[in-house]
């Protein structure tokens, strides 16, 4: 590939992904009991169809992640079936994960597909994922196996 062509591809990539990539750190917050979904209630995406802030009074730690809930009912629903409500890929951007990149997501940009919660770094990624949700989810799941233990920098 010529230097000019490589440069043009770099410019295209920067324009297409630059805003999304510049907004969020490379990896979601890590460490003991990191706060999942930046404090949003994971059950509310399913029951209220909206990102809803949780409160510290209703917290649960699951797989080293601390989740907050808007009310006791949501907390109890999560405790009964955490795998149903927890975001896929540890709350990392699902579209980036499908592309082999672990990137923190914005929990206000989300999608429920095939009964699972996916969050995204930007609305363009959300739309690309939605168009081929099953295939993108499979690619992301395959990449998650190797990227899930990637540490924060």
Placement of each model-derived feature along the sequence:
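Cleavable N-terminal signal peptides
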Residues: 14-16, 26
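N-terminal secretory signal peptides and thylakoid transit peptides that target proteins
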Residues: 1-14
């Amino acid at each position: 590939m010529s230097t000019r062509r490589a440069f043009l591809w770099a410019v295209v990539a920067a324009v297409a992904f630059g805003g999304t990539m510049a907004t969020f750190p490379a990896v979601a917050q890590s460490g003991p009991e990191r706060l999942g979904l930046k404090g949003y209630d994971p059950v509310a995406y399913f029951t209220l169809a909206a990102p809803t802030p949780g409160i510290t009074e209703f917290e649960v730690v699951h797989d080293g992640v601390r989740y907050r809930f808007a009310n006791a009912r949501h907390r109890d629903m999560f405790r009964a079936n955490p795998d149903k409500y927890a975001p896929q890929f540890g709350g990392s951007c699902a579209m980036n994960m499908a592309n082999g990149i672990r990137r923190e997501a914005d929990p206000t940009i989300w999608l429920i597909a095939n009964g699972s919660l996916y969050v995204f770094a930007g609305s363009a990624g959300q739309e690309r994922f939605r168009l081929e949700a099953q295939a993108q989810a499979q690619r992301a799941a395959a990449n998650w196996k190797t990227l899930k233990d990637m540490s924060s920098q």
